[in-house]
Design a protein with these regions (language model features):
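Acidic (Asp/Glu)-rich catalytic clusters
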Residues: 46-49, 79-83, 129-136, 221-222, ...
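Conserved, mostly hydrophobic/aromatic
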Residues: 58, 263, 329
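Internal helix-turn-beta structural module
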Residues: 303-346
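Histidine-anchored nucleotide/phosphate-binding helix
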Residues: 68-81
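Gly-rich Lys/Arg/Thr-decorated short loops/hinges at beta-loop-alpha junctions or inter-strand turns
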Residues: 17-26, 222-234, 317, 321
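Conserved phosphate/anionic-ligand binding catalytic regions in large, soluble enzymes, centered on
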Residues: 54-67, 325
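Active-site-facing alpha/beta catalytic cores
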Residues: 2-5, 72, 85-240, 244-245, ...
Length: 348
């Protein structure tokens, strides 16, 4: 008999279950309280109950745990300094959606060499999230598929669905099950209506198939996620200007949704020029000073060192510098956060 299945599978390897990994790296009572409390604070900001600004900031992607922890330690200092005005959350992205091909993130390829030691990558990701939360810094990530989130979602305070997946039915269903607030990016073409559709879908109850914490395929019934929101990330042109935000709020109002959103300073809004994030920041700060209540949060890409670098076999990497999108350096990060806090002063 001719084989009709697995014809293009090159390798199959056993994967640790989420339950097994959680036993190795368990959530402590203190971390559980921290995650729960930070989620509640974020929800209040997104609902307009808290006038502070949500600031999701950090490296484009995590590739070096030592550098990530140094960044988290510095970020905790900024959290303490500006906690009356800002809710600062660290961007901890372990999976990278690629337009074509490329390094897909720490979980898929922790050794940066195509060896795909996924079990090791999952361990590193969970270990880092525990350490960052233990510092008192909430974490944010993108949920890229239906499986990986099972290993880390209990340690995440804010999640994102990316521009390439906001229109995907299974991602909307997954968002309806997530325990944290979830932002939906507008499409890569700049269309924010698909993000509004995603918010509406994620608020509803859904049924979908997914492995549970023990790896058993399961039928999930969700209750819906009431904390979905738009992330304005630009497209072929930026969409962070006041008229863009007003148009998005009009669409939210049309469907009786909270008129609060997050603005991404990077990606289409900086036209892939990382230093333009500072220009976007200036514009957003002015909108806040002018009385905008729609801007509930921002996203920015920053790391210890400015820019980006390529992975070259046999050559050491520059410590604290991105290997994916270029980021702002630490001094610019401090300036950006200070400007945001100053602008938010006008809300009080």
């Amino acid at each position: 008999m001719n084989r009709t299945d697995e014809l293009r599978t090159a390798r199959i390897e056993s994967l640790v279950t989420p339950a097994e990994l959680a036993l190795r790296y368990p959530v402590t009572t203190g971390v559980a309280t921290h995650v729960t409390d930070s989620r509640r604070r974020i929800e209040k900001i997104l609902n307009g109950e808290d006038k502070r600004l949500l600031v999701i900031i950090g490296p484009c992607s995590i590739h070096d745990l030592t550098a990530a922890m140094e960044y988290a330690t510095r970020l905790q200092s900024l959290r303490n300094q500006y906690q009356s005005r800002l809710e600062i959350v660290m961007r901890t992205y372990f999976e990278k959606p690629r337009t074509v091909v490329g390094w897909k993130g720490l979980i898929s390829d922790p050794d940066l060499n195509g060896s795909y030691r996924v079990n090791h990558g999952l361990e590193l990701a969970r270990k880092l999230l525990l350490q960052v939360n233990e510092l008192g810094v909430p974490t944010a990530t993108e949920f890229l598929d239906m499986v990986t989130g099972q290993f880390i979602a209990d340690l995440i305070s804010w999640g994102a669905i990316g521009a390439r997946t906001t229109e995907s039915q299974i991602h909307r269903e997954m968002a309806s099950a997530l325990s944290c607030p979830v932002g939906f990016k507008n499409g890569t073409d700049g269309n924010s209506r698909i993000a509004v559709d995603a918010i509406r879908a994620a608020r509803a109850s859904h049924m979908f198939l997914s492995p549970d914490k023990n790896g058993q395929m399961t039928i999930y019934q969700t209750s819906g996620n009431p904390y979905g929101h738009i992330i304005m990330r630009g497209g072929k042109k930026p969409n962070y200007h006041a008229d863009d935000i007003a148009a998005a709020c009009d669409t939210l109002h049309e469907f009786d949704l909270p008129e609060h959103l997050v603005v991404d300073f990077s990606h289409g809004n900086c036209q892939k020029q990382h230093r333009r994030q500072l220009e976007v920041c200036e514009d957003i700060c002015q909108q806040i000073r002018n009385g905008s209540t729609a801007i509930a949060g921002i996203m920015a890409e920053s790391f210890l060192r400015e820019g980006t670098q390529k992975i070259v076999g046999g050559q050491p990497l520059t410590y604290g510098q991105s290997i994916t999108d270029p980021c702002l350096g630490w001094e610019d990060t401090e300036r950006l956060v200070e400007k945001l806090a100053s602008a938010v002063d006008t809300r009080f």
